[in-house]
Amino acid sequence: MATIFDILNTHNNNNNFENCKRQCSTNKSNKTIIDILPSMDVTMTNDKLIIETELAGISKDHIEIDIKDSILTI
């Protein structure tokens, strides 16, 4: 499965959205990761990666964040 870094790197380097979608595996609802990926701002500093995204209509209490095997899940 592609990581968020792979997705961003592919999308930024060759700007080929379809190629990026093909790299992502599908989930149980047959949507690829990119189909459910909200727009986000990604900033990298020397010691951290900052990801900002809007999750309209979702309460802060209902947001879960998990990192496992280099995969960030929000």
From Swiss-Prot:
<keyword id="KW-0346">Stress response</keyword>
<protein>
    <recommendedName>
        <fullName>Small heat shock protein hspG10</fullName>
    </recommendedName>
</protein>
<feature type="domain" description="sHSP">
    <location>
        <begin position="31"/>
        <end position="74"/>
    </location>
</feature>
<comment type="similarity">
    <text>Belongs to the small heat shock protein (HSP20) family.</text>
</comment>
<dbReference type="InterPro" id="IPR051779">
    <property type="entry name" value="HspG1-11-like"/>
</dbReference>
<dbReference type="InterPro" id="IPR008978">
    <property type="entry name" value="HSP20-like_chaperone"/>
</dbReference>
<dbReference type="InterPro" id="IPR002068">
    <property type="entry name" value="A-crystallin/Hsp20_dom"/>
</dbReference>
